[in-house]
A protein has these predicted regions:
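N-terminal amphipathic alpha-helix/helix-capping segment at the start of soluble metabolic enzymes
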Residues: 1-27
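Alpha-helix-loop-beta-strand connector modules within alpha/beta enzyme cores
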Residues: 8-11, 58-84
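Hydrophobic faces of well-ordered beta-strands that scaffold small-molecule active sites
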Residues: 24-27, 45-47, 84
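Conserved, mostly hydrophobic/aromatic
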Residues: 26, 30, 37, 76
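Glycine-rich, proline-tolerant flexible connector loops at the mouths of alpha/beta enzymes
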Residues: 33-34, 44-70
Length: 84
C-alpha cells in the first residue's frame, strides 16, 4: 500500500481473488482488538462463535446465541473503518 487506506468491500474481495491476491483475515471480539487489526491493514475481521470459548469460558461453541454474535459484531463494527 502507498499509505492510503481504502475500505475493503465485497467487490474488492472478488478482485483480490481474480488477481490471486492473498487476503489477511483475523478474529476479533472486542473494540480494542478490532481497532488494532484495522490499523494494521488486516483486510477482513471475523467475529465467530468461538467467542463462546475465548470470551465466555464455555467448553464448546454450542451455547453461543445469535444475540451473542450480534453483540460482538456491533462492537467490532464500531472499531473498524477499513477492513471488511
Amino acid at each position: 500500500m502507498n499509505g492510503v487506506k481504502r475500505q475493503i468491500t465485497v467487490p474488492k474481495f472478488v478482485s483480490f481473488k481474480q488477481q490471486g491476491h492473498r487476503i489477511s483475515m483475523l478474529t476479533a471480539y472486542d473494540y480494542l482488538s478490532a481497532k488494532i487489526l484495522d490499523e494494521a491493514n488486516i483486510e477482513a475481521i471475523l467475529v465467530g462463535d468461538t467467542v463462546g470459548m475465548v470470551f465466555q469460558g464455555h467448553e464448546t461453541t454450542l451455547p453461543v446465541t445469535l444475540d451473542d454474535i450480534i453483540y460482538h459484531a456491533e462492537i467490532v463494527g464500531r472499531a473498524v473503518h477499513h477492513a471488511l
